[in-house]
């Protein structure tokens, strides 16, 4: 008797899906097939096109809100019609366990010298409250002298100012190395850096605003409250770009540095001036969000280097708003994710599945090639005979040249509501399978695609 829901676990699931549909040249569509996963702990679930697939699909992460019924994208990048009933969509799904790092985006940076001749404001009063391992500072500054800067997004105001705080009789050992902003009296003002020079604490203050939405100008007075704690973070950012790089637990959400209305010819870029340090322990891995009509490159974010993201349009008139999410950065130990020195640029990341075998010349990664096998229209869930649960295998990202062995992956619990003709050709063991194959016409349902237009809102 067919179970109401198929359930199984696997390190890698390969989809080899067919459907009675034809994609025109350049056509991009989204679909669901009823496949879901149980939420994994501290892992990012990725989907990537297999190198055997004629249909393209972006390398992306699955948003947790979509775990119940995963959406996929399929794109015909050829000049010919693509018959999805004859040429299957081939995707690989796997989960990477990221490091649960702590991130300090506003460290107190000690410097030796600073130009003290031009006092940047008329009045500054500070109250220091000492709680042992915490110092709270309440600041009032007036007659602030703002300096205009040129933003990357031309519809925005950008002004910088310094606020100097005399430490008075506060012991330097109470000026701890990690700061947290508790209150700023103006919503368009942020603190990008905090510097300590002798008995002077310097707040590098930023006023940034979209004047098309809010034509208020920079404030002449500010009330600020911040706290300092002796916190040693795994990742230390060189500056705080809170509207663009938002620190989460275990990841950083990356937002666009400007408003973008795409064309089909010219790639566009977002660059971030912030770098990070981790004492050579971690490497950042930027994984794009699935955005309709926009292709975003995956990249390695190396320590002490700025983050640089390249995009291009797959459809006309797709819009990305300032600070709109482009993807997330996850951090991995350098033993798993080495620096990205040998990356080949590619708009469409592809993957393959391999088995580690011993040869006379040493270990070899033998590609698991399934492309030569015809895909039945009848849906089925199978395993590959020689890829047993005990075997050493993994997944390789071709452009990034990164191999994730099985010990660096997390098995996923999958579930699927099957059709009457769906065959499950193995009994799910207690041990997760290394590789499972879901193939055939499982009932793909194409879903409406919406342009990335959204009402404009200030961050």
Swiss-Prot record:
Glycosylated position list: 76, 100, 281, 321, 452
Keywords: Glycoprotein, Signal
InterPro entries named among the record's database cross-references: Herpes_UL82/UL83
Record's signal peptide: 1-20
Keyword Nuclease: no
Keyword Glycoprotein: yes
UniProt record similarity statement: Belongs to the herpesviridae UL82 family.
Protein name per its UniProtKB record: Protein U54
Originating organism: Human herpesvirus 6B (strain Z29) (HHV-6 variant B)
Lineage: Viruses, Duplodnaviria, Heunggongvirae, Peploviricota, Herviviricetes
